[in-house]
Amino acid sequence: MANPGGGAVCNGKLHNHKKQSNGSQSRNCTKNGIVKEAQQNGKPHFYDKLIVESFEEAPLHVMVFTYMGYGIGTLFGYLRDFLRNWGIEKCNAAVERKEQKDFVPLYQDFENFYTRNLYMRIRDNWNRPICSAPGPLFDLMERVSDDYNWTFRFTGRVIKDVINMGSYNFLGLAAKYDESMRTIKDVLEVYGTGVASTRHEMGTLDKHKELEDLVAKFLNVEAAMVFGMGFATNSMNIPALVGKGCLILSDELNHTSLVLGARLSGATIRIFKHNNTQSLEKLLRDAVIYGQPRTRRAWKKILILVEGVYSMEGSIVHLPQIIALKKKYKAYLYIDEAHSIGAVGPTGRGVTEFFGLDPHEVDVLMGTFTKSFGASGGYIAGRKDLVDYLRVHSHSAVYASSMSPPIAEQIIRSLKLIMGLDGTTQGLQRVQQLAKNTRYFRQRLQEMGFIIYGNENASVVPLLLYMPGKVAAFARHMLEKKIGVVVVGFPATPLAEARARFCVSAAHTREMLDTVLEALDEMGDLLQLKYSRHKKSARPELYDETSFELED
């Protein structure tokens, strides 16, 4: 792994933190980690424009009514528990069976109470099954419940051509089969569907090697390794990089896979406020000054865990500042680019390209193929000695089954498209169209008066709903208008910050986006969701420049 302090790396392992010394920096980068060519008079001339983010607070009355709604729901929940215990309530699905009385509880008391009395009321808005490719339009299986959302049954009816605003299909590559996918069919005929072995045994194919070389070339790093599962790419590789005697500094809004990997590592974990470099620097300073608890020994390693784009907030990591801090305090940086690779940057190369940074300034680049590439799995990229070390020590490499050959071919096909290696500019057009669709969609929502979170360049667009009753009404009304949306609430978000999360795609036409926006405008008035107090801006004059064909 690259040593930001200039120290040596032995067998891919990070050296003891106290032994790191100030060394020469990358020849292409200045002290703050920004490429020299992207600076004017020592200051980045574009950085301030890139960090344009909105996290408007809700009006006081909205928060008051939100907590009142939860309070009323809680009171009725206790009343229903009382009625269940006395056998008065008709639905007994929430009552513990007698033969399970001595079982260890699966959930804490509050989580259990919340699930059976609050979540179950609106459960029909989650886990909706689809029966088509998750393109810009999809088919949804209709279902109903006869026991207040504890179980569902399918009616046999299919809701056709629902506008898909929930899938992470950023570049529109998750599509029905067409002639351009013939290579996937050919790979399926030659290699079959699975490898039936691990990478350490007989599970490494030439397709895996081809994919890893292509990923490294795409990211402009020395080497890369691919894994069959994106979640496990984080949770099973972080324990191979750090352990006891190490310190992990993690953003408070990091994905569960990062949190799980950090916990499994056995390292000490400290949390810094979301995208707050002052909070991060305080933790770094204290770590260097005080060392480990009780012994005061220097930390073996200090690893900073962040994401490129945060999927619940739509915010982009403040990468130049974090790189400056990791250099200053001789720490290491691990970035999860699951939602940014392929979707952020002029050519889709993620947050390093977005900020004009040298990718070698980041010690560990992680990403998944489940979003922009229309496939599954993940990768770790960086220095060759880092990747070689993970090939030997990663739990995913040693124990997990290798990536399916057709999946690997789909990723190869997608990468070649994005990089222009297929002889066309269709990949670049998709990246550019995604950026235009994102800006258009976000600015129209702001004009309407909604509170939306995140960076104006992030294709994940959270729209704040706040009140639990409005969450259910919003999702149900949108489905009636044949628009599929994802709504999110506690525990995935803070209790009073329930939201709808829209995922913009390059495959969305302007007509589709306008249909969604028209429905949102109507829902905003009906449910009184237009909470923003900011001055509305003029509508941007953006035009639909989609030039690639969309599948039927």
Swiss-Prot record:
It catalyses: L-serine + hexadecanoyl-CoA + H(+) = 3-oxosphinganine + CO2 + CoA; dodecanoyl-CoA + L-serine + H(+) = 3-oxotetradecasphinganine + CO2 + CoA; tetradecanoyl-CoA + L-serine + H(+) = 3-oxohexadecasphinganine + CO2 + CoA; octadecanoyl-CoA + L-serine + H(+) = 3-oxoeicosasphinganine + CO2 + CoA. Keywords: Acyltransferase, Endoplasmic reticulum, Lipid metabolism, Membrane, Pyridoxal phosphate, Sphingolipid metabolism, Transferase, Transmembrane, Transmembrane helix. Residues 1-29 are annotated as: Disordered. The modification N6-(pyridoxal phosphate)lysine is found at residue 371. GO terms for molecular function: pyridoxal phosphate binding; serine C-palmitoyltransferase activity. GO terms for biological process: ceramide biosynthetic process; sphingoid biosynthetic process; sphingolipid biosynthetic process; sphingosine biosynthetic process. The keyword Lipid metabolism applies. It is a single-pass membrane protein. Pathway: Lipid metabolism; sphingolipid metabolism. One of its GO terms (cellular component) is serine palmitoyltransferase complex. The chain crosses the membrane at residues 59-79. Expressed in most tissues, except peripheral blood cells and bone marrow, with highest levels in heart, kidney, liver, uterus and skin. SPT complex catalytic activity is negatively regulated by ORMDL proteins, including ORMDL3, in the presence of ceramides. This mechanism allows to maintain ceramide levels at sufficient concentrations for the production of complex sphingolipids, but which prevents the accumulation of ceramides to levels that trigger apoptosis. Component of the serine palmitoyltransferase multisubunit enzyme (SPT) that catalyzes the initial and rate-limiting step in sphingolipid biosynthesis by condensing L-serine and activated acyl-CoA (most commonly palmitoyl-CoA) to form long-chain bases. The SPT complex is composed of SPTLC1, SPTLC2 or SPTLC3 and SPTSSA or SPTSSB. Within this complex, the heterodimer consisting of SPTLC1 and SPTLC2/SPTLC3 forms the catalytic core. The composition of the serine palmitoyltransferase (SPT) complex determines the substrate preference. Belongs to the class-II pyridoxal-phosphate-dependent aminotransferase family. Component of the serine palmitoyltransferase (SPT) complex, which is composed of SPTLC1, SPTLC2 or SPTLC3 and SPTSSA or SPTSSB. The heterodimer consisting of SPTLC1 and SPTLC2/SPTLC3 forms the catalytic core of the enzyme, while SPTSSA or SPTSSB subunits determine substrate specificity. SPT also interacts with ORMDL proteins, especially ORMDL3, which negatively regulate SPT activity in the presence of ceramides. This is Serine palmitoyltransferase 3. It comes from Homo sapiens. The gene is SPTLC3.
